Design a protein with these regions (language model features):
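Secreted/periplasmic carbohydrate-active enzymes, especially glycoside hydrolases
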Residues: 1-204, 208-209, 214, 218-219, ...
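Polar, glycine-rich mid-to-C-terminal structural blocks
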Residues: 279, 310-312
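An active-site-proximal structural segment forming one wall of the substrate-binding cleft
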Residues: 239-256, 286-290
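Catalytic metal-binding/acid-base residues of hydrolase active sites
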Residues: 6, 227, 265-269, 292, ...
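Substrate-binding clefts and catalytic carboxylate motifs of secreted carbohydrate-active enzymes
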Residues: 28, 32-35, 42, 48, ...
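Active-site groove signature of glycoside hydrolases
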Residues: 246-275
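Hydrophobic residues in well-ordered beta-strands that form the structural core
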Residues: 222-224, 298, 359
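Active-site cleft segment of glycoside hydrolase catalytic domains centered on the general acid/base Glu
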Residues: 232-239, 265-286
Length: 436
């Protein structure tokens, strides 16, 4: 088997995210990734095997709903499902194997998944023929939890839940987009949690699914995001590629309990044509149809056309100014361009105070003491001189945001680690400690 993998960043038909289109990395664009960079494998599967399942957990009705898809069907085949708490079977079902027919499994006194208690049930799927022979067996897991919006709050398991996120771009010094080991994926989550974050906005990269596994196991909230930068939004081919790839991403990752938000786009500002507004709307509607169980943040910090909640980016370094900027009378800070996209097209929406509001990029502080000046090294605003200056600035910014906790239901700090010349991480690029 020979695989030829090619990705031409210059075509703009494939979204490269933050891979630099220049020879070298610059500003917030980094070293390009070549070849197959995520885990791939070959597996022998029975022709009537289980291709995938979509799992919906309903904590209000105390049940799990499993919708199976098979490679193909054969008369007499059945699907057996067992849900286990340790070695104890808490629910089981044996049904005729049928494409896309939901299987409802009641769970008595369910144990819920949350960051504080990331409980996972083991699940065993078995496809059997008419004689009872097992054709295919899949071991999996499920976390019972609910994420929903009510008014201006985002709820986890029917309780308002404040999200303290960090921006994670998933770059590594040696493998670029490829983590050096499974332990490294787990370690990124553990060091984020050690710094006080309860989750991450996974930024401009489709993360290895193993990362989601560790997030599920450790109780770490994540936002899934497409590598949307660099596409040509006026290209039909680019739009088709985006929709095709985004569909695959949502279908692959939608069963992970740790994943609580979809973010297909980052900072879209192309507000000059109605086509962009329609594209954003189409992707939003597609995402909601593929996965109605999670909110969609259509564009992080950019053009606000249609979304389940509003997000903004602000790198104002002065905490007092940030406080005044965020909430002035009845108007929240919104960096989007005012007015309409243009006459005769979509109205440009403003935050109306009726949906959740999150500052999903702020901070980005470089510290001169922690990162001595190097050519092209940067952070947002003027660098903090000492680590103590960094602590004070960080504290003032966080206080500015959380002081509006009745209006703002979460934040995302930029960023978890330094990435090449962007040296504003909580940790160094090699994952060693930078601060107390």
């Amino acid at each position: 088997l020979v695989v030829h993998a090619e990705s031409d960043l210059r075509s703009e038909d494939l979204p490269p995210g933050k891979q630099s289109h220049k020879l070298y990395s610059h500003v917030c664009m980094y070293t390009r990734t070549t070849g197959i960079w995520q885990t791939v494998w070959m597996e022998a599967v029975n022709p009537c095997g289980l291709e995938r399942v979509q799992v919906f957990t309903d904590i209000d009705q105390n049940q799990i709903v499993v919708t199976p898809t098979f490679y193909k069907l054969s008369n007499g085949n059945r699907l057996a499902i067992s849900v286990k708490d340790g070695g104890k079977v808490v629910a089981k079902s044996d049904v005729v194997a049928a494409q896309g027919i939901p299987v409802v499994m009641p769970i008595k006194k369910p144990k819920l998944w949350s960051p504080e208690s990331p409980f996972l049930y083991d699940v065993v799927y078995e496809v059997k023929d008419a004689a009872g022979n097992v054709l295919d067996k899949v071991d999996a897991y499920v976390g019972m939890r609910k994420i929903h919006i009510d008014g201006t709050q985002i709820y986890l398991n029917n309780k308002p839940y404040y999200q303290r996120l960090v921006l994670d771009q998933g770059f590594y010094p040696d493998g670029v987009w490829t983590a050096p080991s499974d332990a490294a994926l787990k370690g990124d989550i553990e060091m984020s949690m050690a710094a006080g974050f309860n989750g991450a906005r996974l930024h401009q990269k489709v993360f290895e699914e193993r990362f989601y596994y560790w997030a599920d196991k450790l109780g770490y909230l994540v936002w899934g995001e497409m590598a949307s930068w660099g596409k040509n939004s006026s290209s039909v081919a680019a739009a088709r590629n985006f929709i095709s790839e985004w569909t695959n991403i949502v279908v692959r990752d939608r069963n992970h309990p740790a994943l609580v938000t979809w973010t297909p786009f980052n900072e879209e500002w192309e507000a000059t044509t109605n086509e962009m507004g329609r594209f954003l709307t189409d992707v939003y509607e597609l995402t909601r149809k593929l996965d109605p169980s999670r909110p969609v943040n259509t564009v992080s910090g950019g053009l606000y056309v249609i979304s389940d909640f509003c997000t903004t980016h602000s790198y104002q370094q002065d905490g007092e100014k940030l406080h005044k900027m965020l909430f002035d009378g009845e108007k929240f800070y919104q960096p989007q361009a005012p007015g309409k996209i243009n006459a005769n097209t979509l109205d440009h929406l403003y935050y109306d105070g009726k949906v959740p509001y999150i500052i999903d990029e702020f901070g980005g502080i470089k510290c001169a003491e922690a990162n001595p000046s190097k050519e092209n090294a940067w952070g947002y605003g003027d660098a903090a001189i000492t680590k103590e200056d960094f602590y004070k600035r960080l504290e003032s910014q966080v206080k500015a945001i959380v002081s509006h906790s009745d209006k703002i239901c979460g934040f995302c700090y930029t960023q978890l680690t330094d990435v090449e010349q962007e040296q504003n991480g909580v940790y160094y690029f090699d994952r060693t400690a930078k601060y107390d």
